[in-house]
Amino acid sequence: MLILTRRVGETLMIGDEVTVTVLGVKGNQVRIGVNAPKEVSVHREEIYMRIQAEKGNGNVAPGNY
């Protein structure tokens, strides 16, 4: 796992087309913005896990996708 430190307003790049920007920090919550092409699915982990379970792929463990 790559671990990075970013401040509010700073961005990181994933490949050539996906950006993740830190929008704000409040207590133990971090607001992030993700810009990605519409053909790239972006989900919170718990939503992704639910989608996989509904597809019958319930054997996907968190962090193993």
Swiss-Prot record:
Looking up InterPro entries in the UniProt record yields: CsrA, CsrA_sf
Q: Give the UniProt subcellular location, in the record's own words.
A: Cytoplasm
Name the predominant localization: cytoplasm
Give the CC-aspect GO terms. cytosol
GO biological process terms, alphabetically, are: mRNA catabolic process; negative regulation of translational initiation; positive regulation of translational initiation; regulation of carbohydrate metabolic process
NCBIfam families attached here?
csrA, PRK01712.1
Stated family: Belongs to the CsrA/RsmA family.
PANTHER family (UniProt xref): CARBON STORAGE REGULATOR
The answer to whether the entry has keyword Repeat is no
Q: Which Pfam families match?
A: CsrA
The protein's job, in short, is:
A key translational regulator that binds mRNA to regulate translation initiation and/or mRNA stability. Mediates global changes in gene expression, shifting from rapid growth to stress survival by linking envelope stress, the stringent response and the catabolite repression systems. Usually binds in the 5'-UTR; binding at or near the Shine-Dalgarno sequence prevents ribosome-binding, repressing translation, binding elsewhere in the 5'-UTR can activate translation and/or stabilize the mRNA. Its function is antagonized by small RNA(s).
Q: Which GO terms describe its molecular function?
A: mRNA 5'-UTR binding
Q: Which keywords annotate this record?
A: Activator, Cytoplasm, Repressor, RNA-binding, Translation regulation
Question: Which classification does the entry list for the species?
Answer: Bacteria, Pseudomonadati, Pseudomonadota, Gammaproteobacteria, Vibrionales
Q: How does it assemble?
A: Homodimer; the beta-strands of each monomer intercalate to form a hydrophobic core, while the alpha-helices form wings that extend away from the core.
* UniProt-recorded name of the protein: Translational regulator CsrA
Q: Does the keyword Chloroplast apply?
A: no
